[in-house]
Amino acid sequence: MSNRGMLIVLSGPSGVGKGTVRQAMLEDEFRDFHYSVSMTTRKPRPGEQDGVDYYFVSKEEFEQEIANDGMLEYAQYVDNYYGTPMKYVNQTLESGRDVLLEIEVQGAMQVREKCPDGVFIFLTPPDLLELRNRIQKRGTDDQATIDKRMQKAADEIRMMENYDYAVVNDEIPNAVQRIEKIIESEHLRVPRVIDQYKKMIGE
């Protein structure tokens, strides 16, 4: 019954399957999700579209957004900024659609400060051995890099206490179903619907 959409933040260690779970959620017909497109100062790659893959802006424009407190979260990688613009998220939420952010733990903590009423879900592997296996199967990292990723994963798992829910990604369909149940329940929380019922009784 809530008119305003809900902000859903999904994060977890590298290799846990955040992107795969996010894509499965968007393909499902459970709810009308909107995946928040990030903003970046890097140049578009062949085939990328502005407003679809990223919002491509200049460094000056991005830094102006930061100065105006217009970013939900941001970080700088290899001389380029990446982040989540607040205005697009707010516009979508006001339209009544849920917004899904798939971001790293550091970014999620920035979002938590600005949007404490969001739903923060931490995606976990069944165990660290399985996480290591998934990273190794990618075939993109050497052993030293994998070890660093595993150490970072342990640090990120320690941050789980800052989230509302922990969901094990053992199988993609199972993880998606668990997240959908969380979202369904969150939409029924009294603080999200109380205004609707007050209007019903004329208050």
From Swiss-Prot:
The keyword DNA damage does not apply. Pfam families: Guanylate_kin (PF00625). SMART domains: GuKc. It comes from the Bacteria. GO terms for molecular function: ATP binding; guanylate kinase activity. Residues 5-184 form the Guanylate kinase-like domain. Transmembrane segments: none annotated. Its EC number is 2.7.4.8. Belongs to the guanylate kinase family. This is Guanylate kinase. It comes from Latilactobacillus sakei subsp. sakei (strain 23K) (Lactobacillus sakei subsp. sakei).
